[in-house]
Regions:
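Active-site metal-binding motif and surrounding structural segment of the metallo-beta-lactamase
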Residues: 32-77
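Conserved beta-strand hairpin/beta-sheet module of binuclear metal-dependent hydrolase folds
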Residues: 1-39, 43
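Metallo-beta-lactamase
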Residues: 2-8, 14, 70-83
Length: 83
């Protein structure tokens, strides 16, 4: 069973409101200004469509062919392939 400190060590603040949870799976929350060498995403969650929460450039850099992207309808409209 995973201990709490180990779980917390997998959560990374990326600046502003962006976070990455290392897995597997690798999960991003509101990726914005993510470093170019960041791990690819298995799941991307977007809270809303504002530019600093819904960055098509960052999403496209992080996504893989099987990455699941979930966001509000307004956010999904900005990201091709989002649900």
């Amino acid at each position: 069973m995973e201990t709490r400190p180990r779980l917390l060590s997998r959560i990374h603040w990326l600046g502003h409101d962006a976070f990455r949870i290392d897995g597997p799976p690798v999960i991003y929350l509101d990726p914005w200004q993510v470093p170019a060498d960041a791990p690819k995403a298995d799941l991307i969650l977007i809270s809303h469509e504002h530019f600093d929460h819904c960055s098509p450039e960052d999403v496209n850099r992080l996504r893989q062919p099987d990455t699941v992207i979930i966001g509000s309808p307004a956010a999904a409209a900005k990201i091709k392939g989002a649900q």
